[in-house]
C-alpha cells in the first residue's frame, strides 16, 4: 500500500482478515487515504485506541493528511496484540496518580508500560502478563521505537522491518521439552509459557498435539518476490 503512495489511515483490529491458510487480506479499504493521479482522497475516520500519540489531541480527522509513520504505529500495535495475547501496550499498572484512567490519555503521554524507562512514564506491565523478555532484544527495541517519542522524531519500524525481524525470530524458535504446545525464542534458557503455567496463567491447553512450526523450506524472500512480480489490475475508469 505504501509503495504505491497510499496510506491505510484507520488501522485497527478490524482492518484485516486471516484465513485458515494464514493468508492475510486487507479489508475496509474504502476508508484508505488514496493518492490517485495527483488527487489525495483523505482517510477521515479512526479508532482512538489505535491512534498514535501525536494525533490523539485532534478533534477530527476531517481534512487531515495521514502519513506512513501513523500507519506504522497501528501496525506495531497489532503485532503487539498478536504476540502478547491481546494486551494493549499502553495498558498496565499505574505508577502515578493520573495514569491508567483513560487509554487515550496514556497513549497521548507515551506511557508504554513495557518501556525500558516505564517507571518514569507511569505504567508497568500487569502482574503475571507475558514478559517482554520473551522477545529478542532487537524486537524489544522495535517496540520501544514504535511506542515512545523516538517513533515520532525519527520514524517507527516499517512493515518491511517487522517482516524481516519476525521472520528471523520464526527461524530461531525452539520447542519446549515439557509441553508439545510450547515454542519460544532460542535466546531464552527456559520456556516462558511453562513459567506462566506455573503462575496459573495458561495460554495453551496441552492436548498432546505437537506444534508444527513453519521453518521447513519456507523462504520469505522467494514468496515476497512472487508477490512483487504480480501485475496490478488496470485502473478503474470513473
PLM-predicted stretches and their roles:
Residues 2-21:
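Catalytic-loop of the protein kinase fold
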Residues 157, 161-167, 171-237:
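Regulatory extensions appended to serine/threonine kinase catalytic cores
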Residues 135, 143-151, 163-170:
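C-lobe helix-loop cap of protein kinase catalytic domains
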Residues 28-33:
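Activation of the activation-loop gatekeeper triad in protein kinase-fold domains
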Residues 2, 83-84, 147:
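Protein kinase-like catalytic domain
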Residues 66-72, 79-140:
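Conserved C-lobe activation region of Hanks-type protein kinase-like domains
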Residues 36-38:
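Conserved catalytic-core motifs of eukaryotic protein kinase domains, centered on the activation segment
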Residues 40-60:
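Conserved activation segment of eukaryotic-like protein kinases, specifically the C-terminal portion
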